[in-house]
Amino acid sequence: LVSVRSGAAISMPGMMDTVLNVGITDQTELVLATESGDTAFARDTHRRFAQLYGNVVLKANVDGFDNGQSADHWREEIRKATGSELPNDATGQLLGAVGAVFESWNSRRAKRYRQHQGISDLLGTAVTVQAMVFGNLDARSGTGVLFSRNPSTGDAEPFGEYLRRAQGEDVVSGSFTPEPLSAMSDAAPAAYTELLAAARTLEHAEKEVQDIEFTVERGELFLLQTRSAKLAPQAEVRTAIAMAREGLIAIRTAICRIPPDRIRQLMAPRICADARAAAVQLAGGEGACPGVGIGIVVTDADEAERLSDQGVAVVLARRTTSPHDLHGMISSTAVVTEEGGSTSHAA
């Protein structure tokens, strides 16, 4: 089985589509169950593929598939939603997945992200076809994201999250709330030690904070991808200074890494201690970025964009976010979610 991912020259986290478990069919599910010795794992993998392929490639907008349902049931639900067939052959699945990843370059969210980040629409993307490893296999398996330094504060300590018995999209999509990375040290201690060493090596080689996606399969570590991390303004400044002091980069390089707009963001409003003490706290959570957002609460991304265009400050509140919410997130002064961790693409 393989995963099909984007490979743009400039990384756009969460903006382009990914399809996992490509190649699983009724027949290969039986083979996977035999080789793994776990029919529940094989069924879970097939269910994950059907739902993701149906939504990403066929635009089915289906949810709630259950491992207790048959593959025929999943195919029928997708057929009713789209009028299209879920392929039950590896070649058809692969061709469909590759086409969908290419097409996602021109999706609304990808175009909006490039506009916001000043990235040319002419660059295009490659497609990466990569062998699958299975974080959903057993209790010694899982998936996560590791930053070689804290992306919110710039602290020179690894920061990340881990989700047991899961696949990578479960973490970065924000659909599940993972555990702190330290949970991995209990579940797979050898892989945890190896991961921290790999993060140091990659950061030293790239001379930038690394955002690493990884999977653990039966205690064995696999690095899926690494890229230069997106950092909060405070973290960007602290990291540049720290790397210059450590001799990783030159002082001139450190200065050039901080564009003027990031300095302006550092001057954004903060809550003073007296106001914090006097405030009535309605809810609490884990901050993905420092600063203060003020506005009326809206729960729909389109509504957030519409009100923002009228000059109204809004805070977007969602159970969880998806890349389809990007236009609303960009238009909001702050985003609040009920689920998802601080290493998700939305954060």
Question: Model-found features: residue ranges?
Answer:
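Nucleotide/phosphate-binding sheet-loop regions of phosphoryl- and nucleotidyl-transfer enzymes
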Residues: 1-279, 306, 312-314, 320-327, ...
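Metal-dependent enolase-superfamily TIM-barrel catalytic cores that perform enediolate-based chemistry
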Residues: 189-193, 285, 297-301
